[in-house]
A protein has these predicted regions:
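Active-site SXXK
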Residues: 12, 30-56, 83, 130-134, ...
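A short, well-structured edge-of-sheet supersecondary motif
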Residues: 1-24, 258-261
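Active-site helix/loop module of the DD-peptidase/beta-lactamase fold
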Residues: 50-89, 109, 138-173, 177
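Flexible glycine/proline-enriched surface loops and loop-helix/loop-strand junctions
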Residues: 25, 111-116, 126-129, 164-171, ...
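Structured C-terminal helix/loop/strand segments within mature extracytoplasmic catalytic/sensor domains
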Residues: 245-315
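Active-site Gly/Thr loop motif
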Residues: 206-264
């Protein structure tokens, strides 16, 4: 599994902490994806504490500019609590249902398929609007609104949130911070809003937020980490509660043993449910072994330290070299018209590294890779968004890339973008005589769209 970092904490103290170095360390700013939702919940709790809102308030009352006589009745009935509990009427995210509208407006322009507050149905648009509500009431993003509390618990000043296309903090997915920053936020949650004897966030709100408010067991896919209920932007587990983010951003809370597990990663190439189940079972095994007995500073301690020091990205299943490699080294392959828009490519190979050279609609590109080892560099595109969805960053983003021969004549290139948003593309090149098959499989939200599909190619007559 492509896990970038993890930590176990007991009674607020770090018991184990590891990073997949040299690419990730304690200062790496990591996209937290839907763990962002739990942070938005804290901001809503602060609004409640300051009596700026009531959970029974109708969200439409705060956005009259988007509602009129045509607004669906089920949308008019949505309360703030319904949104926190993921029990709103639309079938899916409003910005997906109405891509023709700004994200904020779209929430109020869709039709409901069920009464508000009746059925759990995961909906990121709800959280996004809650974040916009914070901005509307206090004139700052939910991150900046929580800055006084963050300062007291030691969360870094450089924490930020990616913006939506219409310029609001993307509370459903956009928080970017270090793992240690997120740990500090989680510890505040675990302590029900208290820090050094001071009440920073309302205890009663956090008690409700981290306990079952609504049943989310609505499909034949029970899992102890996610099917025991849902709170206010927190998942209820069989042993406590949790925060989840796409790609294996997780925080598992075990209150009875005062145990916390946090990790970051990019497992978007795999089914997130599978990775989540595997991680939760692994962490649950650790939970079962946790006692009050102190670990001796002997073999056990040294073994733990060695394992955390040696923690790295997953090993490779292929090989570094094959006899066939030299036959295609530097040769040009011309591709038929394809959905990626790639006209031709070459693979250049050395002993330990190489690069994939190709031309698409934006020009000639060069993707450097290590052979059976990751190489850090820049992904050769400037049209990916960074701080705001849909707005090209204009810069090449950081990436790590590796290649391996999975068969004698089949080369797999794995590229992971590790900027303010995470994405990956697996490029498979299968050679047969003078022909080549190309497959690109990407997993990235709102970018890398033309890095997916198949292509048919032949060795160039120039070769």
């Amino acid at each position: 599994m492509n896990i970038h970092s993890f930590a176990f904490l007991r009674r607020g103290f770090v018991a184990a902490e590891a990073y997949a170095k040299p690419f990730f360390d304690e200062n790496f700013m990591h996209r937290m994806y839907s763990c962002s939702k739990s942070v938005v919940s804290l901001a809503v709790g602060k609004l409640v504490k300051e009596k700026r809102i009531r959970l029974t308030d109708k969200i439409c009352d705060y956005f009259p500019e988007y509602t009129d006589e045509n607004t669906d009745e089920s949308i008019k009935n949505i309360t703030i609590e319904d949104m926190l509990e993921m029990s709103v009427p639309p079938l899916t995210d409003a910005y997906a249902l109405r891509p023709d509208l700004p994200w904020t407006e779209s929430f109020f322009k869709v039709k409901g398929v069920k009464p508000s507050g009746t059925i759990f149905d995961y909906n990121s648009s709800s959280t996004f609007i809650l974040g916009v509500l914070v901005e509307k009431l206090v004139g700052k993003t939910f991150i900046d609104y929580l800055r006084p509390e963050f300062d007291k618990i030691g969360v870094g000043e450089n924490v930020y949130c990616v913006l939506s296309p219409d310029g609001h903090a993307w509370g459903g997915s956009g928080v970017v911070c270090t793992m240690r920053d997120f740990i500090k936020i989680c510890l505040l949650v675990a302590e029900r809003g208290k820090h050094d004897g001071e009440i920073l966030l309302p205890e009663d709100y956090l008690a409700r937020a981290t306990s079952k408010r609504v049943s989310n067991y609505t499909r034949n896919d029970y899992a102890p980490r996610k099917s025991e209920g849902y709170g206010y932007q927190f998942w209820i587990t069989d042993k406590g509660y949790s925060a989840y983010g796409m790609g294996s951003q997780y925080a598992f809370f075990f209150p009875d043993k005062d145990l916390l597990f946090v990790c970051t990663g990019d497992t978007q190439v795999a089914a997130d449910d599978f990775c989540g189940e595997f991680l939760y079972e692994w962490v649950s095994d650790v939970y079962d072994e946790v006692t009050d007995k102190k670990l001796d500073e002997g073999d056990d301690y040294e073994n733990l330290k060695r394992k955390t020091d040696e923690f790295s990205l997953p090993d490779f299943c292929g090989v570094k070299q094959t006899p066939f490699a030299e036959e295609i080294n530097g040769e040009k392959y011309i591709l038929r018209a394809n959905e990626m828009g790639i006209k031709w490519f070459r693979v250049w190979l050395n002993n330990d590294d190489g690069f994939f050279e190709y031309e698409n609609a934006r020009g000639v590109k060069r993707l450097n890779f290590g052979l059976c080892g990751y190489k850090q560099g820049k992904f050769p595109e400037t049209n990916f968004y960074s701080r705001r969805v849909g707005i090209p960053s204009g810069i090449e983003q950081d990436c790590i890339v590796a290649a391996e021969w999975t068969e004698e004549k089949k080369l797999l290139i794995r590229a992971y973008v590790i900027g303010s948003n995470f994405g990956n593309v697996f490029i498979t090149l299968g050679f047969k005589g003078d022909e080549v098959g190309v497959a690109m499989n990407k997993k990235a939200e709102f970018f890398m769209d033309d890095y997916e599909g198949f292509a048919y190619g032949c060795l160039s007559a120039e070769s």
